[in-house]
């Protein structure tokens, strides 16, 4: 658990590893998936709270946002703490002294701002022993809380605990590692480290030469990265082990993964390690395979057992690697992951293999099989980051599901030696996720109990019925936003399903969805939804982008339609928080009920706003000509051919020039020209056409999210893209 103030020691500890890594060729590129990918990187933005773990963002039951991070340094006077931050989102959160400085009222030694007693008396701490003859380690165990989850049944906070214990076990400069889990029943003020979760396959006793008879030992399992998967109902934990030269330092780093049903709440015995292609080994003491990318040298995604670490093998690390008895550092070491809804894939960002390097991204479509493919890297943007995490840039509170553009955070040893920063990363694809629905149809949204979502008659409220009645208020139309999220409009009223996105009330468990017109500039983040497939049933969860909560329906009083945390089990605790909610309440089927109102617009049309038609001035055939509006005259330069795309957007080509309506330069800026250009299929030539309340349509650029807008009702008014103001100059009739 090296920190910014401990870098000199860290550098010495890792020197042998870096020297060995420098002599190892970089891994071969992964076999290309069916799609091709592009990775764009924005300008770095400082992150002002870097420390010795990644930040772990989460939302409490009342909608309050938190993130948590820790440090546990080795010297007698060095800091050891579990810190908590709170605020509107990641950008505004500040350290909560009420939680971070809390002291256990039953034990004055048990503190969040000094975890020395807690770590030494935890399940791992009581098994640990102090270093002998090594003054650098003042304690027998150092523990970091990292990886948070809030129990939907009780509201209790859970977290995984990384232990570094029994330091210098063979007279070296390292230690053993293990992962425990902890629970807080008072919103983080006091904690109980309950038990082991994931531990080494090998002995962690000091000087155990029977287990480690030769030149090396394994320091065990640590540096966990938790992912709570809404699709499968499992926790997945990516973690690492290191192979240490006795009397020296670590010289190799291996990657592993374990999983447990979320319903088991991190308990000992619920975890299974990935070993030899199966979830077959217990989390505590079980064997584990080293993970590698699927590429020309591996089709399985893991190191064969015969080539993985075995303490019975003699020789140094480099000798074992040369003999094929040990893999080199895994390219997937301590990988944090997220679900990218635009790609329809899980993506991961591991630690660099050979020091400072571009950040690599890997992807898989199935966490059950753990086959990760390299899809690209950040090019000129490089770092040697110790700690990384994802965040959806639209909500700035959630790391579980992200859109096409997301934040990639770095803490410690970032680009140019920065201690902390993030960049906006955009992963483009030649084959993004296919829409799970036909956007030309309307759908009935029903849960596993058969209840049907409806807009309440004459109201902005939503409700659910025990069975469908055939009312149009029970039908919903999905429109892709172009970034992996969708807006969901009631087929009868055209209003969008959502939750308030301006306060924590919209994130609170049980928040009731309502319908409303789109916000200024388009759907608010509370009116955006991710459609996440449920792998076990073939159904879906609708995850609200603002809150991270999922849509559920119930016959219980007061919760006919609500948003709650993902669950794959039925609450049996008796707690009012869980309220006996079941998985069936939020596992949804989407059944077509007919065509979406207005139907598809494929074919030739005119477009008019404020009585003036969209016009290709002077019958131009020149790419780059800015479009205008003009008195309708029936000319071919005022005819536009709509071609529907697979995501529901339209390519709009002039009937005379055959050139496409195009946001000039793919600009995201308000006021950018809308021109005609050779049709390329780019997102800046795709337009989302949506019925507007009060009549007409909005025509929104898929690339920028801004609306097709004419400057005035005068002939020759120039057409640009602008934020949605509700103006008649942005409301188009389609003839």
Region locations from a protein language model:
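Secretory targeting and sorting signals
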Residues: 1-31
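Beta-rich carbohydrate-recognition and catalytic domains
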Residues: 32-141, 150-157, 161-212, 230-233, ...
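Beta-propeller and closely related beta-sheet repeat lectin domains
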Residues: 53-56, 142-149, 222-226, 333-336, ...
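Conserved hydrophobic/aromatic positions in well-ordered beta-strands
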Residues: 180-182, 258, 338, 360-365, ...
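Short coil/turn segments at the loop-to-beta-strand junctions that recur within blades
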Residues: 200-203, 379-385, 634-635, 681-682, ...
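Short aromatic loop motif centered on NTY/YTY
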Residues: 208-216, 221-225, 385-406
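Short, surface-exposed tryptophan/glycine-enriched loops
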Residues: 226-228, 393-400, 532-537, 690-691
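Lectin-like carbohydrate-binding module/patch detector with strong preference for beta-trefoil
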Residues: 433-735
């Amino acid at each position: 658990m090296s920190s910014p103030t401990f870098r000199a020691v860290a550098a010495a500890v890792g020197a042998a590893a870096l020297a060995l890594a420098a002599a190892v060729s970089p891994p071969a590129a992964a076999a290309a998936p069916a799609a091709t990918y592009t990775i764009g990187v924005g300008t770095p933005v400082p992150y002002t709270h870097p420390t010795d773990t990644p930040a772990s963002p989460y939302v409490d039951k009342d909608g309050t946002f938190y993130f948590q991070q820790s440090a546990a340094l080795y010297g007698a006077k060095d800091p050891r703490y579990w810190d908590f931050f709170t605020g509107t989102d990641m950008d505004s959160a500040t350290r909560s002294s009420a939680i971070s400085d809390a002291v256990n009222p039953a034990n004055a030694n048990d503190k969040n701002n000094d975890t020395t007693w807690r770590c030494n008396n935890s399940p791992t701490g009581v098994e640990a022993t102090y270093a002998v003859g090594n003054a650098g380690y003042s304690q027998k165990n150092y523990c970091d809380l990292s990886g948070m989850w809030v129990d939907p049944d009780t509201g209790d906070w859970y977290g995984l605990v990384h232990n570094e214990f029994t330091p210098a076990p063979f007279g070296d400069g390292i230690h053993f590692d293990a992962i425990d889990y902890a629970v807080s029943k008072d919103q983080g003020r006091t904690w109980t480290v309950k038990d082991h979760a994931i531990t080494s396959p090998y002995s962690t006793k000091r000087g155990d030469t029977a287990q480690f008879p030769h030149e090396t030992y394994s320091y065990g399992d640590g540096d966990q990265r938790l992912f709570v998967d809404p699709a499968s109902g499992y926790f997945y934990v990516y973690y690492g082990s290191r192979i240490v030269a006795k009397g020296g330092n670590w010289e190799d780093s291996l990657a592993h993964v374990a999983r447990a049903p979320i319903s088991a709440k991190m308990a000992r015995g619920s975890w299974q390690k990935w070993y030899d292609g199966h979830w077959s080994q217990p989390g505590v003491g079980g064997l584990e395979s080293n993970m590698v990318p699927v590429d020309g040298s591996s089709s399985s995604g893991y190191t064969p057992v015969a080539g993985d670490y075995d303490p019975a093998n003699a020789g140094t690390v480099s000798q074992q690697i040369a003999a094929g008895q040990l893999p080199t550092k895994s390219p997937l070491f301590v990988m944090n992951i997220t679900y990218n809804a635009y790609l329809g894939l899980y993506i991961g960002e591991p630690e660099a293999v050979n020091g400072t390097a571009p950040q690599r991204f890997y992807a898989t479509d199935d966490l059950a099989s753990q086959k990760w493919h390299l899809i690209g890297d950040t090019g000129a943007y490089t770092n040697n980051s110790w700690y990384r995490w994802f965040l959806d840039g639209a909500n700035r509170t959630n790391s579980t599901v992200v859109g096409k553009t997301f934040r990639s955070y770095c803490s410690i040893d970032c680009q140019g030696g920065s201690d902390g920063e993030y960049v906006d990363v955009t992963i483009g694809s030649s084959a993004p996720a296919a829409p799970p629905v036909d956007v030309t149809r309307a759908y009935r949204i029903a849960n596993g109990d058969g209840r049907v979502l409806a807009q309440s008659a004459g109201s902005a409220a939503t409700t659910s019925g025990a069975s469908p009645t055939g009312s149009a208020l029970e039908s919903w139309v999905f429109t892709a936003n172009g970034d992996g999220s969708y807006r969901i409009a009631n087929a009868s009223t055209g209003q969008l399903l959502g939750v308030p996105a301006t306060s924590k009330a919209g994130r609170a468990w049980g928040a009731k969805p309502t319908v409303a017109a789109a916000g200024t500039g388009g759907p608010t983040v509370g009116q955006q939804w991710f459609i996440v497939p449920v792998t076990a049933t073939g159904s879906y969860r609708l995850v609200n982008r603002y809150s991270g909560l999922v849509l559920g329906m119930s016959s219980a009083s007061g919760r006919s339609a609500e948003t709650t945390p993902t669950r794959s089990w039925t609450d049996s605790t008796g707690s009012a928080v869980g309220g006996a909610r079941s998985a069936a309440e939020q596992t949804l089927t989407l059944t077509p009920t007919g065509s979406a109102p207005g139907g598809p617009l494929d074919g030739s049309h005119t477009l008019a706003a404020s009585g003036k038609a969209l016009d290709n001035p002077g019958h131009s055939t020149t790419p780059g000509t800015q479009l205008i509006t003009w008195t309708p005259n029936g000319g071919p330069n005022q005819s536009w051919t709509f071609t529907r795309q697979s995501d529901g957007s339209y390519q709009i080509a002039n009937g005379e020039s055959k050139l496409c309506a195009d946001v000039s330069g793919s600009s995201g800026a308000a006021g950018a020209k809308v021109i005609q250009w050779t049709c390329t299929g780019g997102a800046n030539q795709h337009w989302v056409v949506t019925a507007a309340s009060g009549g007409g349509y909005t025509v929104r650029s898929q690339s920028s999210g801004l609306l097709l807008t004419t400057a005035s009702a005068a002939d020759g008014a120039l057409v640009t893209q602008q934020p949605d103001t509700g103006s008649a100059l942005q409301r188009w009739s389609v003839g």
